[in-house]
Amino acid sequence: MKHGIKKRKLSRCTEHRLSTLKNLSISLINHEQIVTTLPKAKELRPYVEKFITIAKNKNTLHGRRLLLSRLHNSKLAVDKLLNVLASRYQDRKGGYSRIIKFSTRKGDCASMAVIELVDRDIAARGKVYSKNKEGGKVVTQS
């Protein structure tokens, strides 16, 4: 019986699956829209929404350290979460991302999906949030 099985395994061992989800979440936070397979997108959605909730509710040193430990020490993604996304979603109580079904992949006919952040900045498409040498935050072309 399959009682209590809630997560998808994605044909990966635990370490590889968690690493895949962390890397996908960093990409989604940086670019605010990514194209991936539908099962990965469905598994990624609650994972990223928990990060946004932590950034929104715990905008302290403890929250920063929690996010750094869960996002492969990606300081740029954590800075964007705490400075940009937390203020953007301050009035929203949940549902920070949406999944739009896409076509199938040509090679293996896998169902593809676009996962994006709601109310994303469309003008920032293809740009990455980064720091300059003086410590200020800038948006650069990727």
UniProtKB/Swiss-Prot annotation:
Biological processes per GO annotation: translation
Keyword Manganese recorded: no
GO molecular function: structural constituent of ribosome
GO CC list: cytosolic large ribosomal subunit
Pfam family, one: Ribosomal_L17
Keywords in alphabetical order: Ribonucleoprotein, Ribosomal protein
Coiled coil: none
HAMAP family for the chain: Ribosomal_bL17
Name recorded for this polypeptide: Large ribosomal subunit protein bL17
